[in-house]
């Protein structure tokens, strides 16, 4: 609902786990998705006014996929801090003492092939709240976003 133009989505890959091949010492084989183009809605209202997307290190999984699509659509700027760099889709492994480990099972890319899993996505405008901001209930990220959208 944010664009009236088609755009390409990110690509991803995941190891093809063939136990016999692993036992034989073969290299990891990969299943790779292709990119595909998303067509805009033709029967719904499209919001075409300016947009600012807020993100930080707590942005991961499908929220990070949304950041990729948002940047690919060229609909606005990302304000905040670098994202977490994890596409989600985790394999859950139970650990002793009721612990759990989550292991990322796929590697995601921008449509142009740039990686963000393990690295994160850099914001266009980096703003991080300080401890003082938090104690004073001040939100410099939101303030920067408002300033950006009004320009």
Model segments located where?
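Structural recognition of the beta-strand scaffold that forms the well-ordered cores
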Residues: 50-55, 77-80, 102
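Soluble non-cytosolic domains of exported or imported proteins
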Residues: 45, 57-61, 132-140
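Stable alpha-helical elements in mature extracytoplasmic
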Residues: 62-66, 75, 138-145
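Low-complexity, Gly/Ser/Thr/Pro-rich intrinsically disordered linker/tail segments
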Residues: 123-151
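Short, well-structured beta-strand/strand-turn elements
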Residues: 60, 73-86
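Loop/turn elements at helix/coil->beta-strand transitions in domains of secreted/extracellular proteins
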Residues: 8, 48-50, 74-77, 151
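Gly/Ser/Thr-rich loop/hinge elements
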Residues: 1-50, 88-94, 105-109, 116
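Terminal peptide-recognition signature
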Residues: 51, 70, 113, 145
